[in-house]
Amino acid sequence: MELSGEYVGCDGEPQRLRVSCEASGDADPLQSLSAGVVRMKELVAEFFGTLVEQDAQGLAEDPDDALDGDDEDDAEDENNSGRTNSDGPSAKRPKPAS
């Protein structure tokens, strides 16, 4: 038995994480699976911790770039503050059939 996960970053490159959950001998398969889940959780935390550190270093190198990207969204949000949201379902209740 194996647990696997895949992360596709902004660059489009997939990163695979795999953990074997094989029960050895008389070991309970559920205990092996549980141990595999714990190992996978640790791998995921380590993997994303590394990505967060890399991202933080990128922001620390040029903090002005991080601030510049938000200006367009803020202006757009201000322009749309009085409009209704047309992306979701209608808030009106349907009329009951007579």
From Swiss-Prot:
InterPro entries named in the record: GON7_meta
A GO biological process held by the record: tRNA threonylcarbamoyladenosine modification
Gene Ontology terms: cellular component: cytosol; EKC/KEOPS complex; nucleolus; nucleoplasm; nucleus
Pfam family, one: DUF4611
Residue spans of biased composition, Acidic residues class: 61-79
Entry keyword set: Acetylation, Nucleus
Record has Nucleus as a keyword: yes
N-acetylmethionine sites (modified residues): M1
Localization, UniProt: Nucleus
Keyword Nucleus carried by entry: yes
Main localization, broad class: nucleus
Region (Disordered): 55-98
Segment forming the signal sequence: none
Domain of life: Eukaryota
Biological function: Component of the EKC/KEOPS complex that is required for the formation of a threonylcarbamoyl group on adenosine at position 37 (t(6)A37) in tRNAs that read codons beginning with adenine. The complex is probably involved in the transfer of the threonylcarbamoyl moiety of threonylcarbamoyl-AMP (TC-AMP) to the N6 group of A37. GON7 plays a supporting role to the catalytic subunit OSGEP in the complex.
Assembly mode: Component of the EKC/KEOPS complex composed of at least GON7, TP53RK, TPRKB, OSGEP and LAGE3; the whole complex dimerizes.
Name listed for the protein in its UniProt record: EKC/KEOPS complex subunit GON7
Organism: Mus musculus
Primary gene name: Gon7
